[in-house]
Amino acid sequence: MKIMRFLFLLPFLIGFSGSAFADSETFKIDVSAEGYRDYILSGTDRNGSVSGIDPTVSVNKGDTITFDIEASRHPFYIKTEFSRGGGDQVTTGILSGTQGTQKGTLSWNTKGVSRGKYYYVCSSHAPFGIGGSIIIE
């Protein structure tokens, strides 16, 4: 009987180790724009402080990123590709707010999102490199 109980519990002990027990967190990042070349971010992510010109943002799957945007003339999108215009928007996870906002809040809950590289992009100035990477681990 003890062996049966152990065998029943074994998959749970193995399968739920490591990051499966990690709590989801919410990270707030302020976004402004400088000229036609850069977003300036200030806030936190899984690695600690996020600040400066177009930095990479790193979170775990299931975390939420809240961008507080004050970037006149720079529509802010979260995308699957670093591209101009309104295409390639993320379609997984839970978005709150409006993609393309220049002033306001855009939140992305990454529950259900595949691990990998995503992008925050100015849809008007992507050819000039305005934007950066979001890494989901």
Predicted regions and their residues:
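Acidic, Ser/Thr
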Residues: D68-S72
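Extracellular/periplasmic metallocenter environments
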Residues: E25-G43, S49-G52, R73, I94-E137
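Short coil/turn motif common to extracellular beta-sandwich-like domains
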Residues: V59-I65
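Positively charged n-region of N-terminal signal peptides that target proteins for export
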Residues: M1-F6
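Sec/Tat signal peptide C-region and signal peptidase I cleavage site
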Residues: F16-A22
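Short beta-strand segments of immunoglobulin-like
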Residues: I53-S58
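Short, surface-exposed beta-strand/strand-loop-strand elements in extracellular ectodomains
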Residues: P75-R84, I134-I136
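Bacterial N-terminal signal peptides
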Residues: L7-G15
